[in-house]
Structure formats: structure tokens, C-alpha cells
């Protein structure tokens, strides 16, 4: 192969820190393989750890995501030291990777900008996330690399750059083979909606299902300087139209107005009945997982949910001390009061929320989101020297009227509990009850959101028991 034609496909992946609010990504590892476009064989590989300019960016959350610790990179080269090699590998070649258009390409451009150099430019791009979503569909469940690899029995994803790009190539080979066979055997198709738990099942679907042919001539679009913020180059119009028309998505600013989904488990008025809710001490960190589910049956739009085992992750937290109470001076865009308060977290609850945050953020990034992640646990700063989190009181809108969707009870010193009835959420009744220093028992739902480039988990109270 002529070394000057640069016809090889450059599969690449970067491992990065997981930034907190206001921080930037920092590359911790770069890995790439050059692949022959005619034989799909690996011709050359390169990988290296990268020392970030600021080692403090490597947080415990970052280590949980990719296993790269500060000690691993303290003697590694800076990005400036490997920039020539990275440029030579990438410039003028077709780039390939999983979610590279929204993530890896942006990180490469940022890294070159930080050292004052022009970034490499591709002559085309293959983003396997967009390509496989369109061509292969969600028959494996979600479109995470780890899920696709498990579907084909390729082992576990290590979240290390060179391993991931090699796995990416193998996944593409397997998917292409399946699509080729389907196009050749139109009467023997597999179900396109099989979940990871049932991928061993063999099902038949209507032979007239669309999307079973392989396009053998796909023009690879070049990427402009701002490509990281542009749509995927593949035809995702159906998904985009669905996003535009979907009425389930609500603004994070208007989170208090969201409707309670019928499937949500709500605690009964008997405070001894905690069915569906677990205390933090009763939960196992290894059983916490984040998964993608359709917004509604048949939808291509996916929403992220948190599970404990196979059940929705819902918490019962007793004796939470309120650090900052409800403050009526903060309003949402409709003029209604924002109903939330901040509580201190005990160590077990803190660990659970950190694990939820880590799992949800990783899935959010892996599924293609570029939104800024808002941690569920508020950072400790200034005089606030204890981990804390914000709890939201849900409201329901019925015409022009609003009412609390959160059940609110009050426990007297005698132990008797009564349900409180409020006229509407626009008055100041809660301000006198949920004050700084008071104590509540809370039944909490953890609800991930991703809207207007903001993503995170909000703690929504299904039921509150205020201690007198």
C-alpha cells in the first residue's frame, strides 16, 4: 500500500477525565489502529497514556470510568509531546470510532488548540454509533459498545483506548456480516428489539421489515472545524423529527411541572409501607445500573433510567437534615415558585448517589450526549463542608391549576402522622415547614434528564414526612 495515499482508515479512541461543572475534559490516553479499507486488517497500532497539565482533574469518578489513576500518568508524556504522532496518524485519513463525531473529535481539537496548533483534519468519517443505530438498529438493546460486544460474545469492554478501537472494528465486522446475511436471506431475520437480557432468544419477524439491505456505496462526508457540534452525517431524520415532536421532554428549569408517569411506584400513606423503596444501607453498589429505555413503545427516542437489580431505583431516606429550606423568591419561567430544598447526606446515601451519578453520566456520554453534566451531589465549598443534594417537590398541572404531586405528611412528637392538604403550590405554606435545621423522611425517585445541553439526575420526592 502506497504510504502517501493515506487510504487507511484510522480507528481511534481517547480516554478522558470526567469533568465536574466548570471543568474541561483532559485526555488521559490515546489509542489508534490503521486498517486496510479493502481487507479490514490491522496494519499499524499506536497507544500511549497522556499526562494532563493538571493532575487534579483525575477524580475518583474518572478512575471508576476507565481505571486510569494519577500514578499511571505522572510519568507519561504530555499531549504536546505526542501531538506530532497523533497528527501523522489522523491527518488526511478517514476517521472511525464509536461516537467520535460528538466526543473524540472534539477532544482532539481541544487538545491541539490548548497547545496552539492546528488540529488534524479527516477526509471522511465513520461514526459507528450513528451508522449502527440506523443500519443495525437496537436489536442488541442500547447502542453502547459494551452492549454490542456482549451481544456478539466479544467479551467485556475495558474502556482502554487500544482495546476499545479493536473491539469497535470487530463489532463493525459482525454487524456488517449480519446485515449482509439478512439481505441475502430476506425471510430469516432476527428481532430488532431484543434486549441484552434476551439476546440469546431467537425470534422471527415480518419479512417485510425495512432496513435490511446494506448500502455498498456510502459517501463519507468531511468534517469542518465545528463538526463536533453538527448532526451526525447519516440520515437520522426520523429520530430528529421524533425528538422535535416528543412531548415527554421537559426543561430542567420546569422540572417541578412534570407529570408523574403511571409506571412510577409511589409510597402509600402508611409510612411503614416502603414497598418499592430501599434504604441506602439495604442497597448494593454493584447492583446499581443505568439503562436506556424507549420513551414509549416503538419509539426510537431513548430515556435513561436507574435500576437496582431489575427494579427502578427508589430510595427511602430517614432523618434527613435540611441545610437550605424552600425559598419562594426563586421562580421558574412560568412565574411559579421553584419548590426544592437542600439536605445533608450521610455516608451511605452519599455513596449511593455517587454511584448512580457515575453510572448515569457514563451511559449518557456513551450514548452520544454532549450535554454538560450536573452532579447530583453538590460540591463542598465555602462554609458548606458537608456533602449535600437538592430534593425537588413535584407538582402536577391540570389546566390552569397546579397541585403538589408529592405527598406531604407531618409526624407529631407523639408519633402520630397526618397527611397535609395544601390549597396550591403558589403560596408560602411549605416555607414554614421545610426550614433550615428541620428533619424529614423522604421517599425519593431518581430521575435522569438531558435537556438544552444540561444533563444530570434530579431527586424527586414522592413522599415527605416532616418531623415536628
Curated annotation (Swiss-Prot):
Subcellular location: Cytoplasm; Nucleus
Entry GO terms, CC: cytoplasm; nucleus
Chief location category: cytoplasm
Cofactor(s) of this protein: Mg(2+)
Protein name as it appears in the record: Protein NEN1
Any Pfam family matching the protein: RNase_T
Ranges where the Exonuclease domain occurs: 11-172
Keyword terms of this UniProt record: Cytoplasm, Exonuclease, Hydrolase, Magnesium, Metal-binding, Nuclease, Nucleus
Amino acid at each position: 500500500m502506497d504510504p502517501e495515499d493515506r487510504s487507511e482508515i484510522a480507528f481511534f479512541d481517547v480516554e478522558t477525565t470526567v469533568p465536574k461543572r466548570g471543568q474541561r475534559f483532559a485526555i488521559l490516553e490515546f489509542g489508534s489502529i490503521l486498517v486496510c479499507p479493502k481487507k479490514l486488517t490491522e496494519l499499524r497500532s499506536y497507544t500511549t497514556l497522556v499526562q494532563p497539565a493538571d493532575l487534579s482533574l483525575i477524580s475518583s469518578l474518572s478512575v471508576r470510568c476507565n481505571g486510569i489513576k494519577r500514578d499511571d500518568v505522572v510519568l507519561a508524556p504530555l499531549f504536546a509531546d505526542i501531538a506530532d504522532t497523533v497528527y501523522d496518524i489522523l491527518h488526511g485519513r478517514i476517521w472511525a470510532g464509536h461516537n467520535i463525531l460528538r466526543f473524540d473529535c472534539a477532544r482532539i481539537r481541544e487538545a491541539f488548540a490548548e497547545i496552539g496548533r492546528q488540529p488534524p483534519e479527516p477526509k471522511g468519517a465513520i461514526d459507528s454509533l450513528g451508522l449502527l443505530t440506523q443500519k443495525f438498529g437496537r436489536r442488541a438493546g442500547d447502542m453502547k459498545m459494551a452492549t454490542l460486544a456482549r451481544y456478539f460474545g466479544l467479551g467485556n469492554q475495558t474502556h482502554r483506548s487500544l482495546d476499545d478501537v479493536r473491539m469497535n472494528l470487530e463489532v463493525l465486522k459482525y454487524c456488517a456480516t449480519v446485515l449482509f446475511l439478512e439481505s441475502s436471506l430476506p425471510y430469516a431475520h432476527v428481532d430488532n428489539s431484543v434486549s441484552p437480557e434476551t439476546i440469546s432468544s431467537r425470534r422471527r419477524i415480518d419479512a417485510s421489515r425495512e432496513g435490511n439491505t446494506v448500502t455498498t456505496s456510502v459517501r463519507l462526508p468531511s468534517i469542518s472545524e465545528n463538526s463536533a457540534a453538527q448532526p451526525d452525517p447519516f440520515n437520522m431524520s426520523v429520530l430528529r423529527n421524533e425528538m422535535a415532536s416528543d412531548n415527554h421532554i421537559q426543561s430542567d428549569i420546569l422540572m417541578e411541572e412534570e407529570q408523574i408517569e403511571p409506571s412510577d411506584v409511589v409510597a402509600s400513606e402508611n409510612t411503614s409501607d416502603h414497598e418499592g423503596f430501599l434504604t441506602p444501607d439495604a442497597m448494593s453498589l454493584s447492583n446499581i445500573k443505568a439503562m436506556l429505555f424507549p420513551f414509549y413503545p416503538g419509539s426510537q427516542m431513548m430515556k435513561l433510567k436507574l435500576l437496582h437489580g431489575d427494579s427502578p431505583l427508589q430510595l427511602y431516606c430517614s432523618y434527613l437534615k435540611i441545610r437550605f429550606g424552600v425559598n419562594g423568591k426563586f421562580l421558574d419561567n412560568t412565574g411559579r415558585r421553584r419548590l426544592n430544598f437542600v439536605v445533608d447526606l450521610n455516608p451511605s446515601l452519599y455513596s449511593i448517589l455517587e454511584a448512580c451519578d457515575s453510572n448515569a453520566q457514563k451511559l449518557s456520554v456513551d450514548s452520544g450526549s454532549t450535554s454538560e453534566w450536573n452532579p447530583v451531589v453538590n460540591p463542598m465549598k465555602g462554609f458548606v463542608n458537608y456533602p449535600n443534594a437538592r430534593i425537588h417537590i413535584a407538582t402536577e398541572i391540570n389546566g390552569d391549576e397546579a397541585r403538589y404531586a408529592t405527598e406531604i405528611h407531618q409526624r407529631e412528637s407523639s408519633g402520630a402522622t397526618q397527611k397535609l392538604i395544601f390549597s396550591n403550590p403558589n403560596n408560602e405554606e411549605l416555607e414554614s415547614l421545610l426550614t433550615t435545621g428541620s428533619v424529614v423522611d423522604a421517599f425519593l425517585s431518581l430521575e435522569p434528564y438531558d435537556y438544552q445541553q444540561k444533563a444530570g439526575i434530579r431527586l424527586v420526592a414522592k413522599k415527605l414526612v416532616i418531623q415536628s
